[in-house]
Amino acid sequence: MDSFDLALLQEWDLESLCVYEPDRNALRRKERERRNQETQQDDGTFNSSYSLFSEPYKTNKGDELSNRIQNTLGNYDEMKDFLTDRSNQSHLVGVPKPGVPQTPVNKIDEHFVADSRAQNQPSSICSTTTSTPAAVPVQQSKRGTMGWQKAGHPPSDGQQRATQQGSLRTLLGDGVGRQQPRAKQVCNVEVGLQTQERPPAMAAKHSSSGHCVQNFPPSLASKPSLVQQKPTAYVRPMDGQDQAPDESPKLKSSSETSVHCTSYRGVPASKPEPARAKAKLSKFSIPKQGEESRSGETNSCVEEIIREMTWLPPLSAIQAPGKVEPTKFPFPNKDSQLVSSGHNNPKKGDAEPESPDNGTSNTSMLEDDLKLSSDEEENEQQAAQRTALRALSDSAVVQQPNCRTSVPSSKGSSSSSSSGSSSSSSDSESSSGSDSETESSSSESEGSKPPHFSSPEAEPASSNKWQLDKWLNKVNPHKPPILIQNESHGSESNQYYNPVKEDVQDCGKVPDVCQPSLREKEIKSTCKEEQRPRTANKAPGSKGVKQKSPPAAVAVAVSAAAPPPAVPCAPAENAPAPARRSAGKKPTRRTERTSAGDGANCHRPEEPAAADALGTSVVVPPEPTKTRPCGNNRASHRKELRSSVTCEKRRTRGLSRIVPKSKEFIETESSSSSSSSDSDLESEQEEYPLSKAQTVAASASSGNDQRLKEAAANGGSGPRAPVGSINARTTSDIAKELEEQFYTLVPFGRNELLSPLKDSDEIRSLWVKIDLTLLSRIPEHLPQEPGVLSAPATKDSESAPPSHTSDTPAEKALPKSKRKRKCDNEDDYREIKKSQGEKDSSSRLATSTSNTLSANHCNMNINSVAIPINKNEKMLRSPISPLSDASKHKYTSEDLTSSSRPNGNSLFTSASSSKKPKADSQLQPHGGDLTKAAHNNSENIPLHKSRPQTKPWSPGSNGHRDCKRQKLVFDDMPRSADYFMQEAKRMKHKADAMVEKFGKALNYAEAALSFIECGNAMEQGPMESKSPYTMYSETVELIRYAMRLKTHSGPNATPEDKQLAALCYRCLALLYWRMFRLKRDHAVKYSKALIDYFKNSSKAAQAPSPWGASGKSTGTPSPMSPNPSPASSVGSQGSLSNASALSPSTIVSIPQRIHQMAANHVSITNSILHSYDYWEMADNLAKENREFFNDLDLLMGPVTLHSSMEHLVQYSQQGLHWLRNSAHLS
């Protein structure tokens, strides 16, 4: 070998080792100069008219160009003579000297070609455009396989460059490529086919599949000269692969072998492109390559390749599978790999023609070399994996494999091939995945199996799938955070997972085996799972679905679970798994599998029950085991009644996580209802897992805890489930529910008194609190009509029917499903509430009667009943004393969250009322626990400011519209200002989205009430970031805006419009009054300061400058001095105009400070005027609607200017609730 060859080899070695940079750079410069000279010399040999390399090789110049290239590269003897005569032949690596035997040269050339080809493949991946045109010359050069080494200097300049580069590559390939003989052969076969299909694609393919070439450093490709020499990039990869294997295997044969294995993995990414390339290139010179190959073996291999290539074009045309072609390739490739290892020399000839692609592969060579070690390992693994993958792929659907294949293929390609190849593989992951599958299948089939196109596709899918699963297993722990990023859905799922995990931990019943089996099933039936589970997952995943059809979601989840009954866990896991796939969150999927699977195991028993209740007859045969855990869970839930403290703690932890998330949802989502429901779902979900695995599973499937609650309460858990759920809903559950309502019910109470969320939430807490005695009474009195309410002491059922009547109108607006549940739940729980409330009222009747005024519509009875309804309120709300009411309302007003809120002590009345008669019958078996819980609740029940739970108001039964009027149950539970802020935003967003003006105004008014509560919480709490005064002032503006939406003074104004206006005026009056009280101290200070200032200034002004001139010093040019202090305002100007001897105090100009003080003082004192003005306006409107406001005053107690903000909020919310019912707004 010439000194230059040695230097070049050293250069490559040095480059791979990155040792001698200066030497390498010097060699590069020398090589560039030599190439430039050669190209200039070559110009003479070729017709100047042919600017072979003047234009990009991609431009198809027709047969002339290809013929020219073939002629240039094909005449090996001429090239040999030329190189031998050339003085610079020493610079060409692998160019045999006249005395050097040609066979070694051929070997070297083959190695170089294979190496360069491998290099070209990565580079072609990176620059497919270049590799495609280069591929044609490669074929030509293949024809002159010896020409590669000797044709390192192609007759044409561009060709010479390409050949020189190829020779350099070959030199590198000699060292490195010798290690890759097997890979070269495989690559050659693949390259031949691939080059025919499409050079760039082929290159990409080979970069992934024929990583044997990876051994070559990318230094040449990286050189600008290489970039300039597109012909080199255009070199056919087949030649390089065929040649490279002979010598390269010596150095890195094992790595090459691994590369081949990995190449099968990697190839899939690029094969689709090669298929197209094959169609294009096959016409060029693939057959010629075979003809020009120096060795018979090479020719035979090339011919086989060509034949395969000829087959492939139609297949490549059918690129959709793309795998079929690869399967064909893989067989020859595999054979070629085997042969290449055995027959390095013969294939050298073949490889030589293909060597032209080496230019493209040079860049990736170094990376490939670096990756060879990993590739070898991967190859070994892949061999085993292929077989496993085939089995899996046979069962797996091709689509699933494609999805997974893309990841594994990109993974394999990146590891086995250069970054370019990895990128290309990622670009065509689906196709590459199919290709890799086909290759793996073909390679295996080559052993003794015909290629199964369908099976190979399935195999790659399975292989990819298998690899993906393995990869997911590794990656999942890191990915779970992605869920949060993914969307509310992700956060919800995380929350759901955490609670589920907690439940699983509590239950300790989730079999790990079931989860793995589920995973396997998911892998095998991912398509089915993806189809159905995605739907199911979407239901939980998509908030809209969750809210809209929680029962349906539950049914779906149950059904999804049912299809694979063989594995009880599998159904649940499968559903989440598809969701994960659909979501694209692999870790999430895995987490879902475990957590959801566990949750499913623990909770599924109730899910089937819920499904049954939902009417979805879902049979979950494998779940008996799960049912046991469920039963245990129920037992544990019952135990939780006893150990409610621990459960509550857990729930509180879950709630703490949920609370911020619910807030986030509220903030992020414009539709307050959706956000609130989502937050509710999340909070409830987390709480549920702790309280009930059943509810967790249901919540996961349905996505709406409300609906889950309803489903569980109504029959979601079935007669069995209700009992278990009721037991589960002990004080701990109640506390949890209180928190959930804390986030959920408030908005709905305001928005929809009858909203399923409230009803279901109330139902839950009520269920836990029901007294069996009350329950026994309730069913009996359900049919009774509201008229029976003559005496509050009369049975609860009497008041309950009115509640049904009142509930139904509001429910009409609700969806049928909601209506059904509401009707069942609300009617039952309201009846229970009424019965309990009336029972309490009967006990309190003596005291309540003294407070209650006999108003029209049997207000005495109503009051006595209504007061008991809030039976745990510290004081009966007496309409007479607003202050006492205010104190009560402070206790109750902040949140109207349903009493069912998680307080273990949440209103017993609401709990009992929410209990259904059927619940009673169902719960009676467990009556002991329920009664205990109910008694505990009744004992501890402070009135919680749960969002208005609608308790049928007895006057409703007596009055005309009163039948629609229900008493809201308010929760005294303290809330943070942030909570009210979120609720207010949710309501405001809901109002923003509405079109109907009256409903819009109602929602704005309710949002204003939440803002008022927020301001009140700011007053009472430590939160000082935003002053209550500012909150109130902004609320005033919101109310004014709401009132402008619906005028009350026009001739078309309805009574509801006037009633709404009156309520808004009351709020404005009290807000202004409150604003004055907040700033009263400031007003007093301002008043004193102003009085003092004007006194002093008037005295001083008497001498030189009386205040007569509008308070300005007569001579002061700047009466409104920008400076705050009077002394500065005095200034030289003022003093000049006035007697300079005058003291600053004598100057009468009003400082800006004083002006600002006066303005602030006026604004504060104006609040009093506004307050009285609005109060008078409200009184005038109230006189026009005496009946409405008399009832409201009797029920809630009259509002006065001295009423507390809590009382005002509750009073207004009750009135708005009645207005909403009268307007049939949901």
Curated annotation (Swiss-Prot):
List every position bearing Phosphoserine. Answer: S755, S881
Expression (tissue specificity):
Preferentially expressed in lymphoid tissues, highest levels being found in the thymus.
Q: Where is the composition biased (Polar residues)?
A: 42-52, 251-261, 334-344, 396-408, 485-496, 692-705, 843-856, 894-909
One GO-annotated biological process of the protein: embryonic hindlimb morphogenesis
| The protein, known as | AF4/FMR2 family member 3
Which superkingdom, per the lineage? Answer: Eukaryota
In which compartments does the protein localize? Nucleus
Family statement: Belongs to the AF4 family.
Q: Does this entry carry the keyword Nucleotide-binding?
A: no
Q: Which UniProt keywords apply?
A: Activator, Disease variant, DNA-binding, Dwarfism, Intellectual disability, Nucleus, Phosphoprotein, Transcription, Transcription regulation
